């Protein structure tokens, strides 16, 4: 069986979108997916990088085009339940800690699915945002 390592941050809308497509790939191709939660903000900091919305802030139409591409992806894969979390960007540290516990207890994949749906579909999880100074 083929395996895929999927590194993701719950706080990223792309994680939700990719997760939904990965579920279809798993079903259709019988691929095993190893979900690996990461803190994307920590990776940005460690690599002296910035999130796209900051990095390309001054580049005319870059963020608008990125949003257009996201919308095209959503339409192509019929991911119509996706909703942009109004508190984006959110802090995902506690969620990732929960993922570690879920993995130890043997239900990581279910945990990931539920959290991503609640962050980017039902909008039941609206953690503190880095913008409001709470953690």
PLM feature spans:
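Single conserved hydrophobic/aromatic residue that forms the stacking wall/gate
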Residues: 125-135
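Proline-centered helix-kink/hinge sites
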Residues: 13, 37, 128-130
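Solvent-exposed, well-ordered amphipathic alpha-helical segments
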Residues: 3, 32-36, 135
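Local sequence-structure signature of Cys/Sec-based thiol-disulfide redox active-site neighborhoods
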Residues: 2-17
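Conserved protein kinase catalytic core
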Residues: 15, 43, 135
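Structural alpha/beta surface segment adjacent to cysteine/selenocysteine redox centers
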Residues: 20-119
